[in-house]
């Protein structure tokens, strides 16, 4: 029999199969929506199937039972096998296929080349000249060298203008002299910098004839290509264990008057001639392209990690029976409780929303990158602002959702057998890397304040498409409860009203402080909380709109209905979360707020039959999830016991610590009692 849910197999836990039999849509068709087309979804399944047939690519034991050194060795082993066999499994030039391959085999804890493909190659692709790409990019793509991106320092991260590493041009030798003037100038945190990489794209302040030309990027050799030992003038190493992501050797890097050729300055957009003449880039933010690249792709990565945790928690909630709703009936599935649904389902909606918003942002990034190659950087400021806000909101809400998923699993969620704690640790790193979240919101706020200034000066026609709503006329009150089924358009108008009101309020506070004599920087700081609120609301509006646009594009009725239910759940949940802003000026009434609550509870119930299938549609294999609680077959308890028995502590009945310390202590206590 052909089922709509394609994950059903004989012998599965009947409670989980029962959930899957209530699906109202084909999970393969939903996967096509998630991953950008039927071909991409099918390729993911084909890659997963091929990988399952290669035993050398399987973990030798569960990762939680390995030491950090063992994990790094295991990851390097699998990475080497992948490099040898990659071309028979995927198209190495396809970023989506490569990402899935890495997730399946190397997992979320990282690998010795994690930054190589995510930041090093994109930096060379975006900022190196054609000649430089011929020299370095080809070698990087062939994995002849391993590289990373070194920007963050011990003393400064997001504040690029105050980075302390210097690159001073020596006209006599036509070399840049890289130097770390003090301990806070050490590069600190770059992934794979500590032990794996032999090259790095380094960000340093460039000095020519005593003048600081600001931060620029340089291609810097770090280690001897034959011995892998650090080159003279280089101080380099691992910064130690972290909250998660410990297969990655995040490192430190210092320079002692270390010389590199002038031509190691990445020169696609900026140049330094032999005589020290500086040719500036066409746009001030053009060198941000590597970070914007990561922020654009981070969104779908965060959506996947949120979906990992939700898969685990929702499947487990479908097989875990606890308590009774009706005392005359047997114990019920935890998923039957409205509180559990309210804890998980809105985050299922967010995962889809983040995926669709992320896909839209990646398309915009690819458009900007293409235009940059021909010298057009007009959209970079818009993209930088958008990705700053999205990066902040999405990483924060993803962390919230993963933690809710862990707690939804009860005590077993705390075990590494659930693997949710590792997912959480990896995901929340995104709240601080590639820009600390509060600072990211303020970067978007600068864009919003400039837009508000246009509105204030009567130049709303000059607003870009992302902020056009700031100059549009608003309805006097929300019409949410007056349109059948709570029309999505009315919800969007409500979000627009809220975002517009808060943006103009925050901007007016900033403008007012300056008009009253405050210095710009002081006025900005005193307005920053309100400005960040505006940035969050603007970003959440964009996510809602992106979700709605995606649903409107879908032709398959069953898929459209299922995603429309998720969209309705999303807008009601999100609106309840920010309702204070709509109540403050009377745009919404308390009666309308009650209506929104009722709609939320209605859609929790409506989504209930599809909950497991909406997550199965992401089509994660058991190897990718690495979770006993989230197993596809639902056989949790017997495998939880099996997993526990694999603990290295269970290889012996009596631990050396007992023989050495605890047993003598107890014996001494017994003797003293006598």
From Swiss-Prot:
Residue sites binding FAD per the record: 149-152, 157-158, 191, 320, 340-343, 411, 436
Quaternary data: Homodimer. Forms a heterodimer with acox-1.2. Forms a heterodimer with acox-1.3; the interaction may be important for the stability of acox-1.3.
Catalytic activity: nonanoyl-CoA + O2 = (2E)-nonenoyl-CoA + H2O2; dodecanoyl-CoA + O2 = (2E)-dodecenoyl-CoA + H2O2; a 2,3-saturated acyl-CoA + O2 = a (2E)-enoyl-CoA + H2O2; heptanoyl-CoA + O2 = (2E)-heptenoyl-CoA + H2O2
UniProt name for this protein: Acyl-coenzyme A oxidase acox-1.1
Reported impact of residue 340 to A: Loss of ATP and FAD binding
Effect of residue 391 to A: Loss of ATP binding and severe reduction in FAD binding
InterPro entries for this protein: ACOX_C_alpha1, Acyl-CoA_ox_N, Acyl-CoA_Oxase/DH_mid-dom_sf, Acyl-CoA_oxidase, Acyl-CoA_oxidase_C, AcylCo_DH-like_C, AcylCoA_DH/ox_N_sf, AcylCoA_DH/oxidase_NM_dom_sf
Induction line: Induced by high temperatures (25 degrees Celsius).
BP-aspect Gene Ontology terms: ascaroside biosynthetic process; fatty acid beta-oxidation using acyl-CoA oxidase; pheromone biosynthetic process
Consequence of gene loss (knockout): RNAi-mediated knockdown abolishes production of dauer pheromone daumone 2, severely reduces production of daumone 3 and increases production of daumone 1.
GO (cellular component) term, any one: peroxisomal matrix
Active site (record annotation): 434 (proton acceptor)
Regulation: Activated by ATP. ATP binding leads to a conformational change that promotes FAD cofactor binding and enzyme activity. ATP binding likely occurs during acox-1.1 folding and/or dimer formation.
Location of this chain's protein in the cell: Peroxisome
């Amino acid at each position: 029999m052909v089922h709509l849910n394609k994950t059903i197999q004989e012998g599965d836990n009947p409670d989980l199969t029962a959930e899957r039999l209530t699906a109202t849509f084909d999970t393969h068709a939903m996967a096509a929506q998630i991953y950008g087309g039927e071909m991409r979804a099918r390729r993911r399944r084909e890659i997963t199937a091929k990988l399952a047939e290669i035993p050398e690519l399987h973990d030798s034991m569960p990762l939680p039972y390995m030491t950090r050194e063992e994990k790094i060795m295991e990851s390097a082993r699998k990475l080497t096998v992948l490099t040898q066999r990659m071309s028979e499994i995927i198209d190495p030039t396809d970023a989506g296929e490569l990402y899935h391959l890495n997730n399946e085999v190397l997992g979320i804890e990282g690998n010795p080349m994690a930054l190589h493909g995510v930041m090093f190659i994109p930096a060379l692709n975006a900022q190196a000249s054609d000649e430089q790409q011929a020299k370095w990019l080809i070698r990087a793509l062939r994995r002849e060298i391993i590289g990373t991106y070194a920007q963050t320092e011990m003393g400064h991260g997001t504040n690029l203008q105050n980075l302390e590493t210097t690159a001073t041009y020596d006209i006599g030798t036509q070399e840049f002299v890289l130097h770390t003037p003090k301990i806070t100038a050490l590069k600190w945190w770059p992934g794979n910098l500590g032990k794996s990489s032999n090259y790095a794209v380094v960000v340093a302040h460039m000095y020519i004839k005593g003048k600081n030309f600001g931060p620029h990027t340089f291609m810097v050799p770090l280690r001897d290509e034959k011995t892998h030992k650090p080159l003279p003038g280089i101080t380099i190493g691992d910064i130690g264990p972290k909250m998660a992501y410990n297969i990655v050797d995040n490192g430190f890097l210092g320079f002692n008057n270390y010389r590199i050729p002038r031509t190691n300055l990445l020169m696609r957009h900026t140049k330094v001639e032999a005589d020290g003449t500086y040719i500036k880039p066409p746009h001030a933010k053009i060198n941000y392209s590597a970070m914007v690249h990561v922020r654009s792709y981070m969104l779908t990565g965060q959506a996947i990690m949120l979906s990992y945790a939700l898969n685990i928690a929702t499947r487990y909630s479908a097989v875990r029976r606890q308590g009774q709703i009706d005392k005359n009936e047997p114990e019920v599935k935890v998923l039957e409780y409205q509180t559990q649904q309210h804890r998980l389902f809105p985050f299922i909606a967010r995962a889809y929303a983040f995926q669709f918003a992320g896909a839209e942002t990646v398309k915009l990034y690819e458009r900007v990158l293409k235009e940059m190659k021909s010298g057009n950087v007009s959209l970079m400021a818009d993209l930088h602002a958008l990705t700053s806000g999205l990066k902040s909101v999405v990483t924060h809400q993803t962390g919230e959702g993963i933690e809710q998923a862990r707690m939804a699993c009860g005590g077993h969620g705390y075990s590494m057998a659930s693997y949710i704690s590792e997912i959480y640790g990896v995901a929340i790193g995104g709240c601080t890397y590639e820009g600390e979240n509060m600072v990211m919101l303020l970067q978007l706020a600068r864009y919003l304040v400039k837009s508000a200034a246009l509105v204030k000066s009567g130049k709303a026609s000059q607003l870009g498409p992302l902020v056009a709503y700031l100059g549009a006329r608003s309805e006097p009150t929300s019409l949410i409860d007056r349109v059948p089924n709570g029309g999505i358009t009315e919800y969007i108008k409500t979000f627009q009203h809220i975002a517009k009101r808060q943006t103009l309020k925050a901007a007016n506070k900033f403008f007012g402080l300056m008009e009253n004599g405050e210095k710009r920087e002081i006025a900005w700081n005193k307005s920053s909380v309100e400005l960040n609120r505006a940035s969050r609301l603007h970003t959440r509006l964009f996510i809602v709109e992106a979700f709605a646009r995606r649903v409107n594009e879908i032709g398959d009725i069953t898929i459209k209905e299922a995603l429309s239910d998720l969209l309705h759940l999303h807008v009601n949940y999100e609106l309840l979360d920010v309702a204070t802003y709509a109540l403050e000026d009377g745009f919404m009434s308390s009666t309308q707020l009650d209506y929104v609550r009722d709609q939320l509870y209605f859609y929790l119930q409506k989504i209930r039959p599809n909950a497991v299938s909406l997550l199965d549609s992401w089509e994660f294999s058991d190897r990718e999830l690495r979770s006993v609680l989230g197993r596809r077959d639902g056989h949790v308890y017997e495998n939880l016991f099996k997993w526990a028995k694999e603990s290295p502590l269970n290889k012996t009945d009596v631990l050396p610590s007992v023989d050495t310390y605890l047993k003598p202590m107890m014996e001494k206590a017994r003797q003293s009692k006598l």
